[in-house]
């Protein structure tokens, strides 16, 4: 399994190298607007991925609620408590949050201090979104990927040769997958942020760009 962990880590590094030049495409598109059309299909694919992640997040929310209900009934009605039941709703909650983040970014569903933004024109909003992505979103998500690397390596057993399965004897043996949600969250946020930037450039340059179906 340690070989799998190392391979997974190298895969993330390659992905990071691949994303670095791609992240510059929206900025280059400001000077060469025709690029927005060339990358339109990629943007649509990312938007579709955001929709899929939102659907997964919705089912995860249902599983979380059901898991919490089962845990309460087992504890206060039958006097039973199992770590794996608790793990179900904790893991489901984490999946719901991590997967829904990119989908919410696609639809503008994240909480923002909306004092001036709502009064801006569509083009002004696009400029704000573009600046915010490059000053805040991309640096923060890249920092998450970089800083979380050692923790992810330990979870997958790259250092000890054993994957982290559970902190409790009767817990779900999926702790390494649970911790993998963090880099998945960062990567999907970067991808969706990139798609939003391409959409913002199209708005700024008055270029019609087809939305994801």
Which ranges hold each PLM region?
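Alpha-helical transmembrane segments and membrane-interface helix-loop junctions
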Residues: 1-213
């Amino acid at each position: 399994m340690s070989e799998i962990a190392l391979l997974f880590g190298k895969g993330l590094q390659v992905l990071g190298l691949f994303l670095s030049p791609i992240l510059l495409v929206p900025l280059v598109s400001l000077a060469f607007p025709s690029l927005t059309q060339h990358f339109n299909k990629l943007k649509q694919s990312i938007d579709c991925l955001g929709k899929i992640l939102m659907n997964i997040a919705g089912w995860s929310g249902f599983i979380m609620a059901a898991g919490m209900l089962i845990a309460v009934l087992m504890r206060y009605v039958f006097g039973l408590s199992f770590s794996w039941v608790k793990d179900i709703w904790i893991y489901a909650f984490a999946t719901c949050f991590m997967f829904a983040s990119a989908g919410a970014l696609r639809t503008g569903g994240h909480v923002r201090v909306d004092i001036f933004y709502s009064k801006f024109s569509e083009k002004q909003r696009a400029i704000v979104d573009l600046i915010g992505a490059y000053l805040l979103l991309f640096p923060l998500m890249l920092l998450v990927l970089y800083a979380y690397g050692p923790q992810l390596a330990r979870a997958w057993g790259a250092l000890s040769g054993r994957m982290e399965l559970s902190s409790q004897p009767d817990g779900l043996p999926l702790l390494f997958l649970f911790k993998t949600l963090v880099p998945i969250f960062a990567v999907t946020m970067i991808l969706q942020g990139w798609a939003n930037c391409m959409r913002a450039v199209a708005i700024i340059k008055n270029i019609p760009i087809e939305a994801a179906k």
